Amino acid sequence: MKKHSNNLDLFDQTEECLESNLRSCKIIVGDAREAVQGLDSEIFDCVVTSPPYWGLRDYGNGGQIGAEDNINDYIKDLVDLFRDVRRTLKDDGTLWLNIGDSYTSGGRTWRDKDDKNKGRAMSYRPPTPEGLKPKDLIGVPWRLAFALQNDGWYLRTDIIWNKPNCQPESVRDRPTRSHEYIFLLSKGKKYYYDWESIKEPASDPKMDKKNRRTVWNINTEPYPGSHFAVFPRAMARLCVLAGSRPGGKVLDPFFGSGTTGVVCQELDRECVGIELNEEYASLAKERILRRR
């Protein structure tokens, strides 16, 4: 990968353009909060992404989004980032945002460190946010959704990602959580949405297909070589199909292992992915080249 200094003079970015027989995918290694500022305005059809969840995973970089001391700073960091992202969207562009929830720590602030697990849990657990009690469900997805709405985004719908193969939890005082949220937000009142491309089978045999509902049953999807469950291709495919035209351009500011890029290659879209962790960026490159 080729290193170069960017015009912000704030950090080093690695940019790599992977050409295929169909479309290109550019991977930028750096902090999304800075990298997005170097992107042109109104160039993307849609954004498909899953930010790091607050206080859950350590991706090995100081100052990373998700490692804030309190939930309000986490929400603010994401609102500020997605305000810059909105500038890069076409006027009819959309944001497809996957975000999970978490619970307050119950007063415990430290976990045992796990250096062998690259996607390890945070060794530091943020204290219980003001106004909440130990063991409370924080409501992170809706806090973020309403904050984005207040910042100018159109909040169009919530989608429940139901995970049939969810990980078990060692809890006996509540149900095991088996879902996350996907929010569809738009830059403007009118936006591109190809509903026909993601129609689902109808239960009525007289009907061919019907408008897709807001509960998506999609298994989590591990990938060999990673230490975490990657963004499922089936879910990314629905977002890319509905949110972009054939030959269009998609942004993922939290590229991770590159699922959005893999799907864009399959669907004849260009993609720009931003990833803070160089190891994950290398994994993303490998996946895109192998189309896996």
Curated annotation (Swiss-Prot):
Q: Which GO terms describe its biological process?
A: DNA restriction-modification system; methylation
Q: What is its EC number?
A: 2.1.1.113
Q: Name one GO molecular function term.
A: DNA binding
Q: Which domain of life is it from?
A: Bacteria
Which parts of this chain are annotated as the region Disordered? 110-130
Q: What's a single GO CC term here? A: cytoplasm
Q: Which InterPro entries match?
A: DNA_methylase_N4/N6 (IPR002941), MeTrfase_CN4_CS (IPR017985), RM_Methyltransferase (IPR001091), SAM-dependent_MTases_sf (IPR029063)
- Determine if Signal is one of this entry's keywords: no
SUPFAM superfamilies membership: S-adenosyl-L-methionine-dependent methyltransferases
Instruction: State the top-level EC class.
Output: transferase
Give the keywords, sorted: DNA-binding, Methyltransferase, Restriction system, S-adenosyl-L-methionine, Transferase
Q: Which family does it belong to?
A: Belongs to the N(4)/N(6)-methyltransferase family. N(4) subfamily.
Question: Which protein are we looking at?
Answer: Type II methyltransferase M.SmaI
